[in-house]
Amino acid sequence: MRHIKIIKSISLIILLFLITSCSNNSAMKPEDFKNKEPRLIIEEYLSGNVKAWGVLQNRSGKVTRQFSADLNGTWDGKQLILKEKFNWDDGEVQDREWTINKIDEHNYEGTAGDVVGKAKGFSYGPAFKFEYVLLV
């Protein structure tokens, strides 16, 4: 069981990289992974407790902050409620709660209190990209 949690944590690091570092100008697109395995089903993957680690980079790619995060997701068959608690290396603690709806096999929409409008999610194979504007 411990091995599954470690693998899940490592996989989440990769997932968060895709979520946070992919921009509209990125050459890498989720569709590029449509025939790859294993398939990432985000609502299953994020159900329950997940631990994550990551970095924040500025536009030039310099790491400006690091974080660890505790995530807890609940999937009801239509909607994923994802609670995130970020612990930043400078001592800041930040909470966010997402409501994520699955539109179809590949598309998701999400909202959170500090997100402008709706987030758009795209899932193909093992890749998931989440595009949104965050209020800072």
For every predicted segment, state its role:
Residues 1-11:
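Bacterial N-terminal signal peptides that target proteins for export
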Residues 23-25:
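Bacterial signal peptide processing site
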Residues 18-21:
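C-terminal motif of bacterial Sec signal peptides marking the signal peptidase cleavage site
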Residues 33-49:
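N-terminal helix-cap/turn-to-beta initiation motif at the start of protein domains
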